[in-house]
Amino acid sequence: MVDFSLRKTRNYWKGSNSSSKQNSEVSLKNAEKKKPVTNPYANLTVPNAANLPTLDAKERNKAASSMQRRLSIHTANYTAPNLDYSMPLPSSNLIDQAMGDEQPTGKVPAINVDDEYGQRNGHSRSATPTDNETSRRPETLRPPELNRKRLGGSGSSAPSGSSRMTMVAPLNPLSPYANLFHPASLRKILSDPQFSAKKFIHERLSEASAVDIDLFTSNLTELSTDVQEEVKRNIYKSYNEIITVNNDLHEASAELKQLRSSISELTKVTDQFVTVAKSRIQMDEQQKMLHTQRPSSPQKTQSSSLLPPVSSDINGTNPKRDRTSVMILEKMWDTQLATLYKNVEGAQKHLGPASNRHLLIESSDWTELNISTQKPLQTVQLYILNDAVLVAGKTKNKQHELIVSQCCPIRDVTISTDREYRTKLMFNFGNSNTCLYETRDINECMRVLDAFRKAKDDLRDITENEKENSKRIKESLVYLQNTQQTPGREGSKSPAKRRSMGLSPSSASRPLSASMDQFILQNLSISVHSRSKSHDWSSLSHKFKLVDNLIEEVDIDLARLKFDSAVNTLLEAESQLATMKDPTKEEDAIILNVLTLKLDQRRDDILTKVTQRNLFINEIAHLREGVKTLIRLGLPEAGLDLLLQNKSNLIQELLLQVGSSEHPSLYLTELAIVRFQIIKRTVIVFRELFHRDHDKLSSILVSWCSHEVEKHFNLVSKQLLNGDKLSPDAIRYSRKQIDDLKTVGLDFVYKLDEFIKNNINKLG
């Protein structure tokens, strides 16, 4: 390629010299026109074309740029052959061995790069290669005829890529660059922390040939690719490990949060246990002190027991009521309210302070709708408290997620439901504001309704009880005040005078004017409660205080439907009140009478609630407990009345379940079995429960049984009015059931005979 380029340049400058010669000849001709010439070619000299002209630096640059342009245009014709430098060049020894030449074994053929591409000292070589040089050239640089000749004939084609690769000789292990062509050794060299690129190139590659540099470059490129792939694999592996660690950390954080909340709850429970234990230890210590003081000085103990001890009653025998559970419950309520005030902006301002306020239910996922268009307005949460209803909507404030939308006392709130859409609730806050709320869960809607109704019922009961108690206390105080003014002369008062004093013949008293009511309430507060706050530690005042505390315990037990505990506390309060002597002071006498009226009222409350709870119950065990409670309360007549009313209701319920039948005989038989068997069972229960008052109450029982038998025959008579006949089988079964009552001491055969006598014409 280089020779061809030089030849072109030489021809170019040769033509340039001839043109300059022609120009000189033209000038000579023009000069010699004036002179006659006989032979114009006589003095012609032939230029020496073998010698190239001398060029200055400018002309050389111009020629080089021209040659570069020509080579760039005709690249396809003058490009160098493609050589694969990634594999070692073939040697003449390997080719000769493939041709059949014998080579000495045990030696590795070496590649003489200097002989193939010229020595590196810059000396020029002959344009015509020798046979030895031609035999040592690579296949790609040899003429095709020589390759075919050395491979076994002129007619054979060139070998394929696979055969050429098998003919490539391995690298010489004795070469100074052998360790640079192996990835492992090159990686080891480059990974040295003290590696210097300039020093490495200066020491190791300063004497390398172009082929060695190309091989080193290819090896370095492959090593770089391997390193990049390895880096990618490591990055991907690290990414997966980071994702795994992140997931594990997320799970661990969730578990830690749950553990933190559990530990917080456990801490609260342990604190509550510690509080309960301390109060219990304190009460036990005080009880021991009272027991140790009793035998030493009985009179002193009796006088000291009149003081308000912390853990004993009047006699110092029973421990004080433990209110730790109430305290724990109040703490829970306070925590719930604090959370509500923190999450809802303006909740504390709208609700205000109140005692015993607590949260009943918190319901989310509610939507406020426009009443007219039914379009959603905002997402809200409902809070039902024991005395108020609060509705909170979403807010954009970062400190509070919710803001108060509606807040109203529960006594002024009404809720109405939609029959078609059971997930919608209409809230009427007072008399003017009405809102419509909807949820997606019908169970949540029913839960809110139940909580609201429960709060409404509890508030109504509390209000009614307070009004009733206040009314009774006022009436009793007015009555006591009037009787104390004129003792022993109540019977001599005329009806007109009684009416003028606020008393009617049918009732004990009536409330006076508003000023009088206020005076009575002040006297009650001063008499019962103020002395405990002062330093007046008289025995009678503290007895009054302890009895009043027992009455409060009765109210608590009644609210929890613990009738046995309520009866025990009531009997204890009555016994303590009975030990008190008649007070000398008029104010103490009024308080004593007020406490007596309170105890009578609690007795009536127990009677009413026990009767209401057991009047329609079908379980005999609960009925027995209710009757026993009334007997312990000293009301055996009321207990018997409860038992008989319950059995009458049971008979009526079972008879309604029997219903009418197409067979009158079967129907009358079932009626007889139901009624007479229940009568028999009632007599048995009466003997078990009222064995002490059997003689006094047996007449009431017999009267009830007789009345039930009469009701039976009256029912049969109504059945016969329809034209049915009384079969002998029905009479036989009725007689059998009546005879069965003789086992419990009742004989009503005469009533059956009387019935048959009156209906003899209807016998079938």
UniProtKB/Swiss-Prot annotation:
Residues 239-272 form a coiled coil. Its main location: cytoplasm. This is Exocyst complex component EXO84. Component of the exocyst complex. Residues 16-27 have a biased composition (Low complexity). Gene3D superfamilies: Exo84p, C-terminal helical domain, Exo84p, N-terminal helical domain, Pleckstrin-homology domain (PH domain)/Phosphotyrosine-binding domain (PTB). Residues 1-47, 94-165, 287-321, 479-511 are annotated as: Disordered. The gene is EXO84. GO terms for cellular component: cellular bud neck; cellular bud tip; exocyst; incipient cellular bud site; transport vesicle. GO terms for biological process: exocyst assembly; exocyst localization; Golgi to plasma membrane transport; protein transport; spliceosomal complex assembly. Belongs to the EXO84 family. Keywords: Coiled coil, Cytoplasmic vesicle, Exocytosis, Isopeptide bond, Protein transport, Transport, Ubl conjugation. There is a cross-link at residue 232 (Glycyl lysine isopeptide (Lys-Gly) (interchain with G-Cter in ubiquitin)). Residues 133-148 have a biased composition (Basic and acidic residues).
